[in-house]
């Protein structure tokens, strides 16, 4: 191997203290010897040889790209945006050349080592082709109608094609949920389910213009609501089933386990987290959603391409157990934080003056929540005479890492380490991009280049990666054993912003995990899979947390608050801004003790009293009160809704109340008017059905009771 910048390396080496655990490997027992192997052959992983990514970049980029595109089109988009979204998805999922659906299948088959049966594969691919062809026809008709909205024939065509296509999705979805093959087909199911829900949304957006009746629009809307629950629970259940099947005991099993966790999050769970935001009655204007989950790229360690040297691969080199690795690199549920500084401590692995490796041996991370205090964590060895390297990342997004996995060989004992990392970053608020690097020196070793963008590619390829990156570095873990030091990077999605900015012209969703503190009694727990990240829990009364928010003017803008929560008990939610009480209200239990935390356990509710912010930066506080110890209350997120958005809901409530009152001869509701018929009562019932559960759930229940009473009176009168 050629050494790079030999003089620089020697200057590092001359000041370095040799770590005995690395320079005397033969003192340690090992069962992995390279029998009859040639030392040079073992190290023949040419300088900067790139590790073959487990899957093509385009496969994961499809999942990332579709989720990213949808994140920019939540709420009720313009007609042109809807057509553009379909055009994008058609190009991603039904491109020319090899079927993207086949690539999805092959990827998961490889991950879980399970082949899809020939019949199930062929049936799914045939149905997918039919759906793609039908979607393309509908998309073409939709574009024609957008350009000719007053053309009766064009309107009739798109309406009929819509109804036929929606029914086709209902018929074909079961082909992607074949018994015994749910896990390998899961990305197919998730993408098809996503398209079905987007299609159902079109009835709410365009149905009235197409000539659909209010009853027909409500039917499509109700189907969208029920299918959102079904699809969310299905995807979460089979994701967890597949992940648990891969749980093993050794380091090699952890590699596949982590790959499945990461890739299925990108291809399945990220989409599922967006499903509720397709509800146009809840989100009738542009809406900002955020994904706060973390994903982990592959460990930075050499993987030898020659099976004869398998013992030099990091996970075969007396690496820690599955559970030890998981505990070392996967963080416990925590508030969302941002990396500000990394201090790296190096160790020296030396065989000779021409074969040595200064490598990452430990680190100290500094990070903070939004508006919170600085926190630190330390891993690995920090007691070294090699000068530590400190890299600042305050207000910078590290969007890409290029890491060298190094292999140094002492006779029969390999040593795996990381001798170089380039961190590519950009300032959050400025169009300036650069990089910081860790590079203490090495010579005569085998190296492989691992590029994070092979696993977490940008959302698009049409822009520079420092503009279109999809993830930012959030944390670094270290797998540590006597002869292995392997890094694992943790990443958060770019949509989880650093500022909690509330806009006056859109609905702002803020996951509560973005609070800056965690009061006594509150805890962060793993999300159920469909929330896009972790959630907060309390089992006794008190504050959940404080969120530092930034307000875009005008400050006179008023908002109403919504909460997405689950609870085993009736309770009160209290909210305040900068310590001043804003809202307080009673809310119902959503689940029973011992029940699963599934989709139906969560409910989004709202306060009716509006409020405004007086400062550009404020602290918003939410707490849960008036319930018995031992119950469970969870909050996923809060939502700030500009007041104008809820006027329609208020109008609908008043209209329903007036229609009910008009059926009776007096305000005491004892006698129906003579002209009230069954059909009239059914129409009023549909009006009540369309009321917002989020704002007027109790009023809706009360009005339904009156409608039932009216039906009973009408039956008695007819008799």
Curated annotation (Swiss-Prot):
Disulfide bonds: none annotated. SUPFAM superfamilies: delta-Endotoxin (insectocide), middle domain (SSF51096), delta-Endotoxin (insectocide), N-terminal domain (SSF56849), Galactose-binding domain-like (SSF49785). Keywords: Sporulation, Toxin, Virulence. One of its GO terms (molecular function) is toxin activity. The keyword 4Fe-4S does not apply. GO terms for biological process: sporulation resulting in formation of a cellular spore; symbiont-mediated killing of host cell. The keyword RNA-binding does not apply. Toxic segment of the protein is located in the N-terminus. Promotes colloidosmotic lysis by binding to the midgut epithelial cells of many lepidopteran larvae. Active on Plutella xylostella and on Bombyx mori. Belongs to the delta endotoxin family. This is Pesticidal crystal protein Cry1Id. It comes from Bacillus thuringiensis.
């Amino acid at each position: 191997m050629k050494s790079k910048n030999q003089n620089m390396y020697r200057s590092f080496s001359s000041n370095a203290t040799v770590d005995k655990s690395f320079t005397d490997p033969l003192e340690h027992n090992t069962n992995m010897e390279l029998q009859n192997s040639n030392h040079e052959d073992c190290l023949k992983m040419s300088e900067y040889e790139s590790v073959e990514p487990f899957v093509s970049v385009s496969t994961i980029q499809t999942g990332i790209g579709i989720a990213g595109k949808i994140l920019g089109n939540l709420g009720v988009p313009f007609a042109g945006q809807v057509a553009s979204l379909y055009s994008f998805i058609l190009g991603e999922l039904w491109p020319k050349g090899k079927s993207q659906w086949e690539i999805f299948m092959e990827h998961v088959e490889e991950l879980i080592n399970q082949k899809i049966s020939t019949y199930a594969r062929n049936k799914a691919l045939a149905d997918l082709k039919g759906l793609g062809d039908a979607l393309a026809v509908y998309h073409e008709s939709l574009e024609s109608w957008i350009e000719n909205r007053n053309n009766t024939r064009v309107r009739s065509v798109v309406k009929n094609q819509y109804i036929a296509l929606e029914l086709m999705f209902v018929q074909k979805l079961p082909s992607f949920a074949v018994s015994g093959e749910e896990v390998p087909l899961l990305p197919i199911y998730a993408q098809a389910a996503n398209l079905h829900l987007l299609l159902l949304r079109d009835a709410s957006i365009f149905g009235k213009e197409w000539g659909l009746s209010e009853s027909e629009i409500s039917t499509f809307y109700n189907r969208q609501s029920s299918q959102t629950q079904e699809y969310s629970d299905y995807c979460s259940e089979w994701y967890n089933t597949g992940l648990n099947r891969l749980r093993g005991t050794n380091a090699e099993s952890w590699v596949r386990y982590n790959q499945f966790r990461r890739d299925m999050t990108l291809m399945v769970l990220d989409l599922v987290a967006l499903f509720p935001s397709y509800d146009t009655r809840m989100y009738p204007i542009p809406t900002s959603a955020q994904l706060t989950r973390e994903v982990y790229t592959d460990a930075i360690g050499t993987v030898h391409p020659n099976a004869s040297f398998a013992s030099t691969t990091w996970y075969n080199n007396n690496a820690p157990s599955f559970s030890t690795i998981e505990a070392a690199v996967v963080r416990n549920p925590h508030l969302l934080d941002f990396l500000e500084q990394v201090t790296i401590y190096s160790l020296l692995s030396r065989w000779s003056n021409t074969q040595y490796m200064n490598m990452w041996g430990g680190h100290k991370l500094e990070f903070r929540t939004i508006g919170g205090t600085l926190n630190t964590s330390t891993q690995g060895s920090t007691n070294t005479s090699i000068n530590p390297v400190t890299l600042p990342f305050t207000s910078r997004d590290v969007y890409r890492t290029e890491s060298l996995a190094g292999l140094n060989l002492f006779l029969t004992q390999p040593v795996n380490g990381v001798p170089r990392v380039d961190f590519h970053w950009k300032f959050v608020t400025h169009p300036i991009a650069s990089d910081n690097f860790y590079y203490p020196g090495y010579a005569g070793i085998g190296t492989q280049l691992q590029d994070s963008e092979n696993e977490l590619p940008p959302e698009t390829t049409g822009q520079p990666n420092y503009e279109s990156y999809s993830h930012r570095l959030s944390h670094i873990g270290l797998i540590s054993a006597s002869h292995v030091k392997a890094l694992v990077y943790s990443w958060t999605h770019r949509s989880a912003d650093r500022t909690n900015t509330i806009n006056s012209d859109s609905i702002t969703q803020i996951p509560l995990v973005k609070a800056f503190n965690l009061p006594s009694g509150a805890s962060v727990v793993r999300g159920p899979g469909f929330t896009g990240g972790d959630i907060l829990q309390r089992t006794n009364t008190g504050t959940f947390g404080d969120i530092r928010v930034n307000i875009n003017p005008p400050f006179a803008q008023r908002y109403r608050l919504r909460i997405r929560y689950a609870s085993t008990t009736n309770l009160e939610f209290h909210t305040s801004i900068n310590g001043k009480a804003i809202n307080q209200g009673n809310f119902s239990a959503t689940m029973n003790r011992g029940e699963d935390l599934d989709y139906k356990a969560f409910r989004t509710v709202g306060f009716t009293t509006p409020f405004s912010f007086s400062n550009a930066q404020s602290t918003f506080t939410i707490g849960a009160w008036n319930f018995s110890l031992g119950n469970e209350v969870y909050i996923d997120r809060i939502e700030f809704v500009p007041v104008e958005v809820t006027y329609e809901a208020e109008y609908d409530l008043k209209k329903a109340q007036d229609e009910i009152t008009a059926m009776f001869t007096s305000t005491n509701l004892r006698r129906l008017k003579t002209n009230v018929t069954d059909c009239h009562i059914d129409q009023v019932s549909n009006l009540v059905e369309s009321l917002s559960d989020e704002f007027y759930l109790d009023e809706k229940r009360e009005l339904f009771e009156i409608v039932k009473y009216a039906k009973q009176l009408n039956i008695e009168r007819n008799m």
